[in-house]
C-alpha cells in the first residue's frame, strides 16, 4: 500500500514517478509539453497506489499507453499522467486459443507470438504501433479485423473508486458496447490493466507468419513509416475513405509549420522534423474544414487530444 511520504519517496527513487517530464518522448508524433507528474507503474498494484495518491492530492489523472493515438498540447499536462507501457507480458495457450495480455503489451509483439503458435485472429495487428490497453479502449483495427472480433474481456481499475476498492474488475466484450473505433471505455473512469482474447487454435504457424509479414509489408509500403505520426488521423466516414476524400481535394503535401499531410497516404499527418502540437492541431482543423466545405462530410478524428481547451 501507498503510505504517505515514505511511499512517495520510494516511487520517486525507483524512477516509477517523475516530475516535469517532456511527453514528446511518450507519443509517436513526438510532440507534447511536460507532464507535471509522470508515472510508469510496473504492475496493477502500483497503478492502484498511484491513483490513490493522486486522488488524495487532488490531481487529475490521465492514462496513456504507447502514445500512438494521442495529440498532447505543447503546454503539457497538469496532474498525474499514468503511462502503462511497462505493464508488459502475455500468456498464450496454443491448445485452447485463450490469450491474456497486460495493457502495455505492444500489439505487434502479441500478434507475432500468436502467429508463431498457430493462433489465428490477430494478424491484422502486426503493423499497429499501439498497446493492448489502447486497442481494447478504442477498438483498434486494420485490414478488415478489429479488437472487438476476438477480445472476450478486460480487467479494469475504476479510477473513481480507488479510495475504497483495492481490486480490479472484469468487464466482458458485451459490457464494452463496441462500435467502429469506439467502446464505452472511452471517456470513462475504467483503466484497462489487462485483456483476454479468444483466438482460433490449430492453424498452420508458417502460413500465419507469412500473412503477418505480408500485412506488415503492405502497411510499410502504403503508409509513411519514415516520419513520426499517430497512424490514421480520421475515421472513415463509411462508405467513403477519409484518405481518398483528402487526396481528392489536393491536400497531400499541405503543410503548417512542421506538420504535413503525408504524400504517401493522405489520412496521415506527419511530423517532418520540427512540428508542434499546435501545428498538427491546425492542420487537422484545416483538413476537416476543407472536406466539410467541399464534400459536405464531417471527418471525425481517431486521435485523442489532451491538454487543449477543447478535446475530441
Curated annotation (Swiss-Prot):
GO terms for biological process: cell division; cell wall organization; peptidoglycan biosynthetic process; regulation of cell shape. Gene3D superfamilies: 3.30.465.10, UDP-N-acetylenolpyruvoylglucosamine reductase, C-terminal domain, Uridine Diphospho-n-acetylenolpyruvylglucosamine Reductase, domain 2. The active site is at residues 181, 232, 302. Pfam families: FAD_binding_4, MurB_C. Keywords: Cell cycle, Cell division, Cell shape, Cell wall biogenesis/degradation, Cytoplasm, FAD, Flavoprotein, NADP, Oxidoreductase, Peptidoglycan synthesis. InterPro entries: FAD-bd_PCMH (IPR016166), FAD-bd_PCMH-like_sf (IPR036318), FAD-bd_PCMH_sub1 (IPR016167), FAD-bd_PCMH_sub2 (IPR016169), MurB (IPR003170), MurB_C (IPR011601), MurB_C_sf (IPR036635), Oxid_FAD_bind_N (IPR006094). One of its GO terms (cellular component) is cytosol. The keyword Membrane does not apply. Its EC number is 1.3.1.98. Pathway: Cell wall biogenesis; peptidoglycan biosynthesis. It is found in: Cytoplasm. Its cofactor is FAD. Its main location: cytoplasm. It catalyses: UDP-N-acetyl-alpha-D-muramate + NADP(+) = UDP-N-acetyl-3-O-(1-carboxyvinyl)-alpha-D-glucosamine + NADPH + H(+). The keyword Nuclease does not apply. Residues 30-202 form the FAD-binding PCMH-type domain. One of its GO terms (molecular function) is UDP-N-acetylmuramate dehydrogenase activity. It is an enzyme of class 1 (oxidoreductase). Belongs to the MurB family. Cell wall formation. This is UDP-N-acetylenolpyruvoylglucosamine reductase.
